[in-house]
A protein has these predicted regions:
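AAA+ ATPase active-site-proximal loops
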Residues: 123-192
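N-terminal accessory segments that target, anchor, or regulate ATP-driven/P-loop NTPase machines
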Residues: 1-123
C-alpha cells in the first residue's frame, strides 16, 4: 500500500521505530519537529495521515492538528498511559484515532493503513465522517457494490440513503450505466 505519513519527533524512542515500520509497510514518511515550519512541512509532505508521538498539550501539536484537518489528513495520536483523556483530545484536536503507549510499531502501521483506506474510501464515495458508524457504512457499501442484485437502502428522512445508493453504484460494475433512484415509500404496496 502506498500513502504519505507525517510523524512528529516529540518522542524519538517511539517515532523512529514507527517511521521504520511505516516505511517497511510501503508508506512514504516524513518526520517533523515542533521547531520546523509546520505549514511548510505539511505542504511538502502532503500527508494522508499525521502521527503525533507526544506533546499533544503544546501549541505546535495543536497547530499541526489544525493544519492536518484543513488538508483532510487523518490524525493518529500515540498517548501516554494514564495521561491525557482520549475523549477530550479527540474533541480538542479532532483526532481520527489513538493508541496507548507502549505499542508495537507494526500496530501503529496497521492503524495508519486503516486510516488511509478509510480516507480513500471516503474520497471515492463522497461520504465523509470519522465516526465508527460512518466507517461501518463505508465498509458495507464496499461489500455490497460488487453484488449483482437489487439493494434496498432504508433509513429516516435526510439520512443520506440516496448518497449511499449513488456510492454503491459508483463502485459497482454497472457504474457506466445510468443511476436511477426510486423513492420506494412513494410506491403503492401492491406494486412492490
Amino acid at each position: 500500500m502506498s500513502g504519505r505519513v507525517l510523524i512528529t519527533m516529540d518522542d524519538l524512542e517511539v517515532g523512529v521505530p514507527v517511521n521504520a515500520a511505516l516505511e517497511e509497510a510501503g508508506l512514504t514518511t516524513a518526520m517533523v519537529s515542533s521547531f520546523d515550519d509546520l505549514r511548510a512541512a505539511v505542504r511538502r509532505a502532503e500527508p494522508e495521515v499525521v502521527v503525533f508521538t507526544g506533546a499533544l498539550h503544546e501549541r505546535p501539536a495543536r497547530e499541526l492538528a489544525a493544519l492536518a484537518r484543513e488538508r483532510d489528513a487523518a490524525r493518529l495520536a500515540l498517548l501516554e498511559p494514564g495521561g491525557q483523556d482520549p475523549g477530550r483530545l479527540v474533541h480538542a484536536l479532532g483526532l481520527s484515532a489513538w493508541l496507548v503507549k507502549p505499542m508495537a510499531p507494526a500496530e501503529v502501521a496497521s492503524a495508519v493503513q486503516r486510516l488511509i483506506e478509510r480516507r480513500r474510501l471516503q474520497e471515492r464515495t463522497g461520504i465523509l465522517g470519522d465516526s465508527a458508524a460512518i466507517h461501518e457504512v463505508l465498509v458495507k457499501i464496499e461489500q455490497m457494490a460488487p453484488v449483482s442484485s437489487t439493494v434496498l437502502v432504508e433509513g429516516e428522512s435526510g439520512t443520506g440513503k440516496e448518497l449511499v445508493a449513488q456510492a454503491m453504484h459508483s463502485l459497482s460494475a454497472r457504474r457506466e450505466r445510468p443511476f436511477i433512484a426510486v423513492n420506494c415509500a412513494a410506491l403503492p404496496e401492491s406494486l412492490l
